[in-house]
């Protein structure tokens, strides 16, 4: 009994000492940053959906400079916005920072059967990347151009119905319908448009609108209990994962249905034609006995072999799931921000409409027509400079001890780029850094800024977003069709400036617009 009585205070003191050691980690190393609170660190400040994490980080950068640290429970995070250090992380020291910053509640990317291209690392990531990349080649995008245009025309029909009497509409809601419809048709086996009647949309929206803080908090503060909580969370959806579980089951069903269909076709002697969507493309590489390539004693090299270019059924589910979630949200947000900036900068919108009329003469818009819309490219890039989207993706885990600038970085430390500050740094972009100026992208120097690490809307280096070209194609197709017929105008419901909310991504609460029909 006396041993137990002695052990309890000893364990308690050890527990407190450990968390105090983590809490003061950056302070002891002479690195500035917000101290936060014992046990949780600065987590309470970064989990506010009403004031997104990346705006809070931007505020801290103004206080502490281009490199500082803070803790999220036991997670040690280094924030950087120095262009030279950014390039080191993503390019020059890629071998030391090839892992993502993941909350322990998300699982172990080395062991999860459904690890996807976003969370995978090492040889497994290389294999998934090598298999996925052809999906987004120009040749593949040309094949789905007709499908994307059909979804764009379907949305245009709904816009016409909703604005026939001059009503204002929330473009964010409409764009989410478009991206959900498009990704469903090119990645999920959906055969026709389900716009404004897709039962899955509310569940996907809810994933991004989930404001519950206990899930990431438990993972950050009690990492050893994270997998236990994850197990119960997936078994009992009411604990916080109901929406994700529903979406996941839908993807599993879509993949299994396609597998069954292909097997039945083989039995009946029906030849399997060219892949029609992402599921087909991934099933071409399916092999359920594929080896999961793990790193050899923690050693990873950019020149290492890709290994077996095959996917398990579970990995196919993982790829389709991440493409669905990522493709839905980010493209809809980019369209929303672009629309807002066009409405508040009518001279830019007029110039864009002139380009569309000049380059897209035929009623149908081809992939080649889209490639000629250079000014639209500038507008989208400038929009994403001022409103970077999934900045969470611009974070890495230190896999090998190294040095960034004058800071020694230990294994397991998370490094996150303050993209909002980087993208409006006057030393990089000039005195007009905070102004919407698409013409700046006509200057060849902007390409050099990208190469140096000053523009990372789609990431940088080997892990740059694989779906970037698809996102551009979707946006350009839809905007071209809308702006042929309408002009975006600020309405009485339009919030200026936009009210930004969210956690996984930073999004406008609403984007109300008046669409004036062109003569």
From Swiss-Prot:
Enzyme Commission number(s) of this protein: 1.14.-.-
Membrane topology (UniProt): Single-pass membrane protein
Main location (coarse class): membrane
Top-level EC class as recorded in UniProt: oxidoreductase
Transmembrane segments: 3-23
Keywords: Heme, Iron, Membrane, Metal-binding, Monooxygenase, Oxidoreductase, Transmembrane, Transmembrane helix
UniProt: heme binding residues: 465
Signal peptide location: none
Pfam families for the chain: p450
A GO-annotated cellular component: membrane
Subcellular location: Membrane
Family: Belongs to the cytochrome P450 family.
Function noted in UniProt: Cytochromes P450 are a group of heme-thiolate monooxygenases. They oxidize a variety of structurally unrelated compounds, including steroids, fatty acids, and xenobiotics.
Protein name: Putative cytochrome P450 CYP13A10
Provenance organism: Caenorhabditis elegans
Annotated gene: cyp-13A10
